Amino acid sequence: MKHLRQTVLFILLGFLLTACHHTADRLLSIEQLIKLKPDSALSLLRQIQYPEKLSDSNRALYALLMTQVINQSSDEEHKSDSLISVAIDYYKGTTDSVHAALAYYNAGLVAMDNEDSEASLHNFLKTIDWLGESDNDELQFMVRYKMSRLFNLRLIPDEELRLGKAALPYAERTGNPLYICALLPYITHGFMQTNQLDSAYKYSVQAIQLAEKENLVRALSHIYSQHAHLCMAMKDYKQALMYRDKDLAILFELFGEENEYIYDHYINKANTLTELHQYDSAFYYINKAVEDTTDIQYTTRKSLAKAEIYAATGQMDSAYYYMNRHADLRDRLIEERDKEGLLTLHRNYHNDELKKANTRLWQQAVERKLQLYVVTIVCCLAILLGGCIYFFLSLIPQHFDLTLFISS
């Protein structure tokens, strides 16, 4: 009976070990599949039963992969960050910098989806810390690109520009033109908002040329729209209208003429037509942009566009009404975005980075001083030795045959 129990125990143990190895191998296979076929990866992950009963390492990898595949899916939505927290809690206590960086990056994406800017920025900064000098150019690019977008949404153009420029070398090293074309409009916008229009124009033209060459249609819509904004800032309204029409032509082909995504572009065209004194057409497009009170940013822009059209046509009462509405909405928008919290977090991170940099510089200075001391001591010893040799030779009589002295 005792032998039977031992046999059964060994069989169960072997089965469990095999199952553990099988699950680990399966998760590693899914990890390789995510980039190529995220839908298939999601289906395979859902086939894993009782993930909460997996080992700590497998459960962390499962949580990371599930979050990652949901982030890549347009159909799935996050409800909370509890899943990715499992991965972070595990990997932050290990030396696995690859998975730790991925965990924090995906946590940043979840927070971004949930409109929690501070949590998003915190996780992106932790991603950069874990990446260090890693040669993972794609993730190095993506985290800085997402941070640039975050500051774009929060109306902080100097940080949008700084992070966009920091992301560009990594995008270029990946060799993926889509990454470059996605990033360049944010660099352009950062230069525009900091009144560096010549630099903005340079990057905008670069984006247009690359996107047209690679036929990146969806990217071209954003690039054309951004270039039209730039032309407006440079008061080249005819050029701006041309790029507005190019942008809308792409959007009509992709979504049709009546789509909530296009309404914002109608506002942009109305603004351009107002500057060209084509007021009837401006009213036509501003009225095509339907009212959407749930999107404060959209309603703010529409109110300003209406105010400018009414003012240009001498309808000052209506212009005054929409200008006041625009001012109220913009104040509310800035208040809700809580720029100060975001800036404080980023400023603290910069201070920590400066402290680290100063420590490295101090260590380098100490090393240089030590090297200088060593060189000085060696030189002094060499001079002293040379002096001793010279003194010894000076004591020898001039007619003394040194060879005889040595041979003796």
Question: How should each PLM-predicted stretch be described?
Answer:
Residues 73-74, 107, 114, 154, ...:
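Structural motif corresponding to the intra-repeat A-B loop/turn of tetratricopeptide repeats
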Residues 46-51, 85-92, 125-132, 165-175, ...:
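Amphipathic alpha-helical segments of tetratricopeptide repeats
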Residues 33-47, 74-86, 116-126, 156-165, ...:
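Helix-turn-helix repeat elements of alpha-solenoid scaffolds
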Residues 63, 100-111, 123, 140-151, ...:
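TPR/Sel1-like alpha-solenoid repeat signature
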Residues 24-42, 50, 78-81, 280-283, ...:
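Hydrophobic positions within repeat-based interaction scaffolds
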Residues 20-82, 93, 98:
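N-terminal leader/linker segments that initiate helical-solenoid repeat arrays
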Residues 57-60, 98, 138, 178, ...:
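Residue signature of alpha-solenoid helical repeat architecture, marking inter-repeat boundaries
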Residues 9-16:
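Bacterial N-terminal signal peptides
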